[in-house]
Curated annotation (Swiss-Prot):
Function: Regulator of protein phosphatase 1 (PP1) required for neural tube and optic fissure closure, and enteric neural crest cell (ENCCs) migration during development. Acts as an activator of PP1. During neural tube closure, localizes to the ventral neural tube and activates PP1, leading to down-regulate cell proliferation within cranial neural tissue and the neural retina. Also acts as a regulator of migration of enteric neural crest cells (ENCCs) by activating PP1, leading to repression of the integrin signaling through the rho/rock pathway.
PANTHER family assigned to the protein according to its UniProt record, in alphabetical order: PHOSPHATASE AND ACTIN REGULATOR 4, PHOSPHATASE AND ACTIN REGULATOR PHACTR
GO biological process: actin cytoskeleton organization; closure of optic fissure; enteric nervous system development; negative regulation of integrin-mediated signaling pathway; neural crest cell migration; neural tube closure; positive regulation of catalytic activity; regulation of cell cycle
Protein name: Phosphatase and actin regulator 4
Compositional bias (Basic and acidic residues): 200-211, 563-579
Spans annotated as Disordered: 65-123, 196-380, 385-404, 459-579
Acidic residues bias spans: 463-476, 508-523, 531-541
Organism field: Xenopus tropicalis (Western clawed frog)
The UniProt record lists the keyword Repeat: yes
Gene3D superfamilies (UniProt xref): 6.10.140.1750, 6.10.140.2130
Family matches, as SMART domains: RPEL
The protein's assembly and partners: Binds ppp1ca and actin.
Keyword annotations of the record: Actin-binding, Cell projection, Cytoplasm, Developmental protein, Neurogenesis, Repeat
Length: 706
């Protein structure tokens, strides 16, 4: 058959052709979206629309706005303890990679031997001379070349105790200088540096550290030479700096200038050689991203400070040591004669110098106004110089320390600056540390007059227990300090000075402009919500709570927020039109949200809204009433049977039966023949009426014989 091969085999009917109906290939049809899915999406959309947008939260002050660009200097560095800045906030992370390399070299490389101290580079900008020096001065004081040149190298290994290599990582990078300049400066000989191992400290305390009273006042430079530094600190008012915490810093920076007098200025300073150059921010702790926490500093090597070494050189071998391990809170750049470098203060902060034993906290008190770089503090135009006096100390070495007063020119300057003293205090009323209270409720104090006295805490070997105890003491101090907010001891007899902080409007505007440029960002970027009860007195907390509070960035940021009673920048004064506009905006938002709300019926249908009890009872009553009406109008079963409405299989008769013995083979349980006949008759009748049947076949329908 020729036509057979041409026929396609698919047309043949197979015996499984019917299976195609059941096993069809899967076709993707657009499925109708289910009701539950649609309802869920509506609920989610409604919830999302009810959320407040971020801008609104920021406007209402519940969220702090974090700007997009990463500003390197945080506007607010919450102080941890008496004026310390936290590691995360103190400095911008500039060249972390290079710094890590240097740190690794430093930790693996040279550690200071017992007799000598290697002074590593500090900062570039320190090289600038403040006054012209003659060649003889340059010859007499050899320049500390390495100490001020290398671009981003960490601090002196002498300043970092062998246990404490993490501290090296906290040095802030400075702008690198050309290699030619670095090479041209000659290194500092070891002979100029004071040996600083604790071993030697204990042995040579009596010889090395003479009190400053034994040093002639001419040993440190007179006020006329110090004067150019006012412009220096004014230039630096734009940087967050931690100003002098002790009288040491004033004389130390003076000596630093004298030592640095012969140095070659770096390129930035050559341009403005006529103007004195700012003393640099040499070190701030640098926030490292992935670095273990810094171990607590060990008591060794604590005064090994290049500036301290220079100071000892300039003062003819007598070395001053910082009075107290915990510096008081920051003082703004002075327009008066208190030159200082942050380098000194930061080094002392990070490394806890302990060249002299502790001074009790209640014997030293220093007035210090709030600092400018932190946004919640307001700068001060012309505050008096910090003054320090020592009451009779306990140990012999403390007596040595207490015998060293301020240099004469600084005391004269203090006397000129401070107003006339008020009546004397009894010695029990000492200036308490307002530090923690101030940070709990700092306020944007326009041009108000306020002052912040602060005690310098004990200088101890920083064990954890000591830290916690001193923190608790500080946190308990505000009650007594509130009663005497502006008292300070000057000289041997405690007298009182009032330190007014009058704020000129021009300075205030400048600082506000600077603060606007500075961001609130934190290394972790916590979401900051307002606390309404910030101003309440903080209760006594455990040492663990104090530790957590020190480390918790969110708590630190919240502690720096403004109290609600202050003139809050987040809620500025608005005109009536602005308020009306805001009300209209809120009203339209509320209307939109109300229109999106589901109705009560919707919610009831979805079992979200439960009816209240009264409604439920009323509904039950209504149902009962309807049922009873229906039942009362129903005809009885007998009536329905009579009217042939109900048939045999359509009803069940309910009879009341007495309890009886259901066991079989009782004569009264057996059906009598009459009962059986009645049953048969009924069944036959039922069957005969069930279907129409021909007469001749009717006998087939009999169910039982009659």
């Amino acid at each position: 058959m020729p036509s057979a091969p041409s026929t396609p085999p698919s047309k043949r009917k197979s015996k499984f052709a019917g299976f195609g109906k059941f096993f069809k290939p899967w076709k993707w049809r657009k499925r109708k979206s289910s009701d539950s899915f649609r309802e869920t999406s509506e609920v989610l959309e409604r919830k999302i629309s009810m959320r407040k947008p971020r801008e609104e939260l920021v406007k209402r002050g519940l969220l702090v706005e974090v700007p997009e660009e990463d500003v390197s200097i945080p506007s607010e560095s919450p102080p941890l303890r008496n004026g310390h800045m936290s590691v995360e906030h103190a400095n911008p992370p500039e060249d972390i990679g290079g710094l890590k390399r240097k740190t690794r070299q430093d930790s693996t490389g040279s550690r200071p031997k017992s007799g000598e101290t290697t002074v590593q580079p500090c900062a570039t900008a320190e090289v600038a001379p403040v006054e012209p020096c003659t060649a003889t001065e340059v010859a007499s004081v050899q320049p500390h070349a390495t100490a001020e040149v290398a671009p981003i190298q960490p601090l002196a290994t002498a300043e970092v105790s062998p246990v404490q290599h993490c501290a090296t990582a906290e040095v802030a990078p400075v702008q690198p200088r050309p290699v030619s300049e670095v090479a041209s400066v000659q290194p500092c000989p070891v002979s100029e540096v004071v040996p600083v191992h604790p071993r030697h400290l204990s042995e040579k305390n009596s010889e090395k550290y003479r009190p400053m009273s034994e040093v002639a006042p001419g040993a440190s430079r007179p006020t006329s030479e110090v004067a150019p530094l006012q412009k220096v600190s004014r230039d630096f008012s734009k940087q967050p700096l931690l100003p002098p915490k002790r009288p040491l810093s004033s004389s130390s920076s003076v000596t630093q200038e004298s030592v640095l007098g012969g140095q070659k200025p770096d390129p930035s300073t050559r341009q403005q050689s006529s103007v004195p150059v700012p003393t640099p921010r040499t070190i701030h702790p640098l926030p490292f991203s992935k670095q273990p926490p810094v171990p607590p500093p060990k008591p060794q090597n604590r005064s090994s400070n290049p500036l301290m070494a220079e100071l000892s050189l300039a003062l003819g071998g007598s070395t001053l040591s910082p009075a107290g391990s915990r510096p008081s809170p920051p003082i703004p750049p002075k327009r008066v004669v208190v030159p200082s470098t942050d380098a000194v203060n930061n080094k002392e902060k990070a490394l806890r110098p302990a060249s002299l034993p502790p001074i009790p906290a209640n014997e030293i008190s220093i007035p210090s106004p709030p600092s400018p770089p932190i946004s919640s503090h307001i700068p001060v135009s012309n505050p008096p110089v910090p003054m320090l006096t020592l009451a009779p100390p306990n140990t012999e070495v403390e007596k040595e320390q207490s015998a060293s007063p301020l240099p004469l020119h600084i005391r004269i300057q203090q006397a000129l600056n401070s107003p006339q003293p008020l009546p004397l205090l009894d010695s029990s009323q000492r200036a308490q540390s307002l530090l923690f209270m101030q940070n709990e409720v700092p306020s944007e104090e326009g041009t108000r007059v306020r002052s912040l006295p602060v005690t310098i805490e004990l200088l101890k070997v920083p064990d954890d227990d000591d830290d916690d105890n001193s923190l608790e003491d500080e946190s308990l101090s505000p009650e007594s300090s509130e009663s005497h907010p502006s008292r300070v001891y000057i000289g041997d007899v405690p007298s009182v000075t009032v330190i007014p902080n009058y704020l000129p409007t021009c300075v205030q505007e400048e600082e506000e402009e600077e603060e606007e440029g500075v961001s609130d960002t934190d290394s972790e970027g916590p979401v900051l919500y307002r606390e309404d009860d910030e101003e309440e007195e903080e209760e006594e907390t455990s040492s663990l709570a104090n530790k957590v509070k020190r480390k918790d960035t969110l708590a630190m940021k919240l502690s720096g927020r403004m109290g609600p009673h202050d003139s809050n920048p987040e809620f500025p004064q608005r005109s009536r039109e602005e308020w009306n506009q805001i009300r209209q905006q809120i009203g339209s938002q509320l209307n939109r949200r109300l229109s999106q709300r589901p109705s009560a019926e919707e919610l009831e249908q979805r079992n979200i809204l439960q009816k209240n009890e009264a409604d439920r009872l009323a509904e039950k009553k209504e149902i009962k009433r309807r049922l009873t009406r229906k039942l009362s109008q129903r005809p009885t079963v007998a009536e329905l049977v009579e009217r042939k409405i109900l048939r045999f299989n359509e009803y069940v008769e309910v009879t009341d039966a007495h309890d009886y013995d259901r066991r079989a083979d009782k004569p009264w349980t057996r059906l009598t023949p009459a009962d059986k006949a009645a049953i048969r008759k009924e069944l036959n009748e039922f069957k005969s009426t069930e279907m129409a049947v021909h007469e001749e076949s009717k006998h087939f329908t009999r169910f039982h014989r009659p």
